Amino acid sequence: AFFARKYIGQKYLAYFQAYSNTYAPLEELRQKYEEALDCPDVVGLVIATRPDAVTDDVLDYIAGLSRRCYVCVEYGVESANDEVLRTVNRGHTFAEAEEAIRKTAERGIRIGAHLIFGLPGESRESMLEGAVRVCDLPIQVLKLHQLQIVRGTAMAEQYLRHPEVFRLYSYEEYLDFVVDVIGHIRPDVYLERFVNQSPEEYLIAPKWGIKNYEFVAKLEKRLRERGEWQGRWYRGKGKK
């Protein structure tokens, strides 16, 4: 209601963001998605989920929805390094992410992918290579996140016991790394997010104290300073 008053005529995408939003019986999912689409001024859906939490039946249904309205399925890929995925107990492999993305693309559904930079055991080179590999898949949207240590999680306990296992990036280091990623990925992928922000009361580290819009402004400036642009060094096959 607040945004409806502030932005007259604004249309919206209903974002099923938290948790795995395809992990339920099809009829329950159908009810939730249709309920969202019945809301005034909602013109589409963004559905976040895991690569191992989608079935063919669910994808077939979403494909039908995508012929009626805008739909994007976002997969939490997080890393292309299977050893890192095992370390953080993701419960899926990169091959499973590839398969889910391809099955989704075959149905004509728009696809987004999420990557986390700074997971335990992942090197800078591995993260950069992983971003390129993910963008070589038939995705349209990429969202990037820095690793954040959040209170009350298993990773927070591990961090407090063994901080040496973690390589948390400073703001400047992360900024320059994102510039490197932008230069190497497919030029037609939409970058919709560069950083994430956990509430201050839950965040253990890193504490940058910067807003998303501030990061974007500094990123644009750093790209100009370094003479970089998206896809400048891209040599991949793309959308295979």
Predicted regions and their residues:
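Active-site-flanking structural segment that lines cofactor/substrate pockets
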Residues: 1-3
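Auxiliary Fe-S-binding modules of radical SAM enzymes
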Residues: 141, 149-240
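Glycine-rich tight-turn/loop motif centered on a GG-T
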Residues: 83-94, 159-168
